Curated annotation (Swiss-Prot):
This is Glucose-6-phosphate 1-dehydrogenase. It comes from Aspergillus niger. Pathway: Carbohydrate degradation; pentose phosphate pathway; D-ribulose 5-phosphate from D-glucose 6-phosphate (oxidative stage): step 1/3. Its EC number is 1.1.1.49. Catalyzes the rate-limiting step of the oxidative pentose-phosphate pathway, which represents a route for the dissimilation of carbohydrates besides glycolysis. The main function of this enzyme is to provide reducing power (NADPH) and pentose phosphates for fatty acid and nucleic acid synthesis. The gene is gsdA. GO terms for biological process: glucose metabolic process; pentose-phosphate shunt, oxidative branch. It catalyses: D-glucose 6-phosphate + NADP(+) = 6-phospho-D-glucono-1,5-lactone + NADPH + H(+). It is an enzyme of class 1 (oxidoreductase). It comes from the Eukaryota.
């Protein structure tokens, strides 16, 4: 009787229990770009640091027809091995990697996959399976049906990791959710937004609620405006066909930047449990109106000023009449007691002057009187590269006068934590999926609320053919009107600080 109750409770908690043994990770789309750049390097990183469950097995599945040796050769090519030790660890990692080829819409293919899984699961007490869908959204529904019908474990836990995009607007997102609902419980679905796995994004809650001096000033009475900025120094460069279908708003802002906004704006959760955190994020989204077109500017990059870099429309995969925005700046408002009237300025663009993702919180002006035009305080969180936090503050310039100077309290992670490795976002998120921790994954109602905010704007831009994005040069800061746009919502730029971020060579970790 007791064992029956225990098994029942375990089934009820299947979505949140940690998978320690008898686990197989199946990478669907194993020959694709995402698996190559992110999934396999992340799995190897977890293996190197001994975070994968004991006896883990990794199965690749894709349409590409290749034998076991060719598959292992590809896996090896995905992972950098700068030392002999890492090369030996990769050899060991490859010993539990296997591959099966098949179609995404054929029962026979998935029956064959299930036979392979059952073969490598022989002797296990349970069949715990994580299906990582590194696939284009066009096959999500078909593959979901096939997995449930032919590959769902008889005795064990099943989880499915789904990559963005989760639709193109509110209706398509709901259609996708309805397609997944018959096959998968919400607790079995892990919707990845890899920005939620980034170290500095995960640090937002600790900074906010673990430091009283931040918590006390985190409101409309002290904060004038918030900027969340995403900049890439490269264009589409041959991948314009995919990007043109979605654009910068769907690709970056509706998901990555909005997720950061919810963490910045949410109230203190009851606990750090996944549901309590996500409940508070949803409350923020429900307090936001749809983005108004008057609070938006869009741009599309042209040639660089020296002519060395091509314009967006010079990409052979991009239609010549494309109106797809490669840059956007917009302002959102949250209608609640804490944030009413505070503009949240989100900016994102390709082919800009630098690689940077940062959060810039600008506080209100110092009460006038003894100071004249003294610069505002700012809290800046650098998400990437060079993960850092610094506070711009006013201080007395050493000497006999009472002259003020802007200085900074600077926490640069690579200096302060030089002996610690900052994990890649995908490593962190795959580990969370193994643990059954949904905190850093997107819930269904959260997804629905986010699309409600963006869909009217997206339809407005899609339907009004006369709206043409402003051209900006490849390698610039964006459209020429950008500074006036941010200033119109209260942002005050001051060069009194003369602050220059330390430039160091860092890998692109997007």
């Amino acid at each position: 009787m007791a064992s029956t109750i225990a098994r029942t409770e375990e089934r009820q908690n299947a979505g949140t229990m940690e998978l320690k043994d008898d686990t197989v990770i199946i990478v669907l789309g194993a020959s694709g770009d995402l698996a190559k750049k992110k999934t396999f390097p992340a799995l190897f990183g977890l293996y190197r640091n001994k975070f994968l469950p004991k006896g883990i097995k990794i199965v690749g599945y894709a349409r590409t027809n290749m034998d076991h040796e060719e598959y292992l050769r590809r896996v090896r090519s995905y992972i950098k091995t700068p030392t002999k030790e890492i090369e030996e660890q990769l050899d060991s990692f490859c010993q539990f990697c296997t591959y099966i080829s098949g179609q995404y819409d054929k029962d026979d293919s998935f029956i064959n996959l299930n036979k392979h899984l059952e073969e490598i699961e022989k002797g296990q007490k349970e069949q715990n399976r994580i299906y990582y869908m590194a696939l284009p959204p066009s096959v999500f529904t078909t593959v979901s049906d096939q997995l449930k019908r032919n590959c769902y474990p008889k005795n064990g836990v099943a989880r499915i990791i789904v990559e963005k995009p989760f639709g193109k607007d509110l209706q398509s997102s709901r259609d996708l959710q309805k397609a997944l609902e018959p096959n998968w419980k919400e607790e079995e679905i892990f919707r990845i937004d890899h920005y939620l796995g980034k170290e500095m994004v995960k640090n937002i809650l600790i900074m906010r609620f673990g430091n009283e001096f931040f918590n006390a000033t985190w409101n409309r009475h002290h904060i004038d405006n918030v900027q969340i900025t995403f900049k890439e120094p490269f264009g589409t460069e041959g991948r314009g066909g995919y990007f043109d279908e979605f654009g910068i708003i769907r690709d970056v802002m509706q998901n990555h930047l909005l997720q950061v906004l919810t963490l910045l704006a949410m109230e203190r959760p009851i606990s750090f449990s996944a549901e309590d955190i996500r409940d508070e994020k949803v409350r923020v989204l429900r307090a936001m109106d749809a983005i108004e077109p008057k609070n938006v500017i869009i741009g599309q990059y042209g040639k660089s000023l020296d002519g060395s870099k091509p314009a967006y429309k010079e990409d052979e995969t991009v239609p010549q009449d494309s109106r797809c925005p490669t840059f956007c700046a917009m302002v959102a408002y949250i209608k609640n007691e804490r944030w009413d009237g505070v503009p949240f300025i989100m900016k994102a663009g390709k082919a800009l002057n630098e690689q940077k993702t940062e959060i810039r919180i600008q506080f209100r002006d110092v009460t006038s009187g003894i100071f004249k035009d003294i610069p505002r305080n700012e809290l800046v969180i650098r998400v990437q590269p060079n993960e850092s936090v610094y506070i711009k503050m006013n201080s007395k310039l050493p000497g006999l006068s009472m002259q003020t100077v802007v200085t900074e309290l600077d926490l640069t992670y690579r200096r302060r934590f030089s002996d610690l490795k900052i994990p890649e976002a995908y490593e962190s998120l795959i580990l969370d999926a193994l643990k059954g921790d949904h905190s850093n994954f997107v819930r269904d109602d959260e997804l629905d609320a986010s699309w409600r905010i963006f869909t009217p704007l997206l339809h407005y831009l899609d339907d009004n053919k006369e709206i043409i994005p402003m051209e900006y040069p490849y390698g610039s800061r964006g459209p020429a009107v950008l500074d006036d746009f941010t200033a119109s919502f209260g942002y005050k730029f001051s060069d009194a600080a003369g602050y220059q971020w330390p430039l160091t060579s860092t890998p692109n970790r997007l």
